Amino acid sequence: MFDLYSGTGTIAQLMAPVAKKVIGVEIVEEAVVAARENAAHNGLTQCEFIAGDVLKVIDDIKDKPDIIILDPPRDGIHPKALPKILSYGVDHIVYISCKASSLARDLVTIQDMGYSVEKACCVDMFPMTGNVETVVLLSHKKPDGHINVKVEFG
């Protein structure tokens, strides 16, 4: 499992008990240090945290995830990073967004790459403000196993 833009690793650590391995990637080094300390404190040996930009680090990760969790900054995912992330072809992606316009922009690319929105939910993490977190579950469309072809002869 990948937790990209993992911050201090909260989501990775919540998912660790049901995953063989969770790899978190975060650009803020102090957050990665905290994530490693938190995982060690909680005895979560299956968590690995990497400090670096997702755009660059993703090329160096040899593991293949079975699910990807995305929690990017307000500006969303770098346009060059998104195709790299989607190239893993995982069955499910969970995208957590704090800015609806960035989410909408990224969803166009994600859907063009064969994913569909299964569920979406807004979570009011900031009461009395206009800001909400949006959580979206995306599933990769699978071919139905056959192709219908209509041929007309004139």
Cite the ranges covered by each PLM segment:
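Rossmann-like S-adenosyl-L-methionine
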Residues: M1-G154
